[in-house]
Amino acid sequence: SSRKNLQDREFFYPLALATYGVDEVIGALDSMISFRTTMWSKTSQFEDNFAANFGAAEAVMVNSGSSADLLIAFSLREKEFGGLEIGDEVLAPAVTWPTQIWSLVMAGFSVRLVDVDPATMNISFEDLEAKVGPRTRAISLVHLMGNTPDMDRVMELARKHSLVVIEDACEALGTKWRDQPVGTFGLAASSSFFFSHHI
């Protein structure tokens, strides 16, 4: 079969391997048998552990990084969270996963794309700085493929122009900038354990 031929190659890289073991299967079965599959003590424990391990004030578990991006985007319109209004401009990288952009659009923001640095595929600071305008209210960063932009410069720019910063750290779990975990610089961040993300 073609599958056997692929595995006979000297180098075979499957799309994904199992990212769970026996303990995780037993834990999942325990939750299912007890009919406690959402918002149970295991969820709270996971959120607390995640926040503690990654230096965040708190964590909220959702089903995916895309859902987290959507939740963050809509939360930006809350006065006590971001205070952005429909039509406000958010700067975002031109290279990213579509749900990061569409979450902002669905929340009613005007997205202005920023070029990326070809060496890192992350937001170009020079283009970011050039595109800050009078309608700009936020910067949506993506830490692509475990890389991160110069957070010192980004945060200084944000302070200078009173911009909210949000981070998509789905592909950068465990990455740090000057010993600070990415995802802890801005107002909120998304993370993910999806098998193709860089951990």
Task: Annotate each PLM feature.
Residues 1-37, 41:
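N-terminal "arm"/small-domain region of PLP-dependent enzymes with the aminotransferase-like
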Residues 23, 41, 99, 123, ...:
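Residues that form or flank phosphate/diphosphate-binding pockets in enzymes
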Residues 40-89, 103-106, 113-115:
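Phosphate-binding glycine-rich loop
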Residues 95-101:
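Conserved coil-to-alpha-helix start sites within the AMP-binding
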